[in-house]
Amino acid sequence: EASTCGSTPYSASQVRAAANAACQYYQSDDTAGSTTYPHTYNNYEGFDFAVNGPYQEFPIRTGGVYSGGSPGADRVIINTSCQYAGAITHTGASGNNFVGCSNST
């Protein structure tokens, strides 16, 4: 599903690629490079996702799939059954919190 995080638009295929990568890493108990992603997302913000948790978060990028390094502000959320839950961002949120990306939560 296409989504805009802050002022950054993502196509449906970019969102799907991030979700698929998160799923593959999660299922193989692996992470992107030397990072901790994907990792547990506790949904402290209380987003009403279309699928039930538990959730994993994984960075979403405009250029290719995240493979390590700085994660940036934007995340795709999947559940541990690899269902897409939504996209969220630190952009526009206070502290280390998240807000929903448009068209996605």
UniProtKB/Swiss-Prot annotation:
This is Extracellular guanyl-specific ribonuclease Fl1. Pfam families: Ribonuclease (PF00545). It catalyses: [RNA] containing guanosine + H2O = an [RNA fragment]-3'-guanosine-3'-phosphate + a 5'-hydroxy-ribonucleotide-3'-[RNA fragment]. It comes from the Eukaryota. InterPro entries: N1-like, Ribonuclease/ribotoxin, Ribonuclease_N1/T1. Keywords: Disulfide bond, Endonuclease, Hydrolase, Lyase, Nuclease. The keyword Heme does not apply. It is an enzyme of class 4 (lyase). Its EC number is 4.6.1.24. Belongs to the ribonuclease N1/T1 family. The keyword Metal-binding does not apply. SUPFAM superfamilies: Microbial ribonucleases. GO terms for molecular function: lyase activity; ribonuclease T1 activity; RNA binding; RNA endonuclease activity. Gene3D superfamilies: Microbial ribonucleases. Disulfide bonds join 5-101, 23-82. The active site is at 39, 57 (proton acceptor), 90 (proton donor).
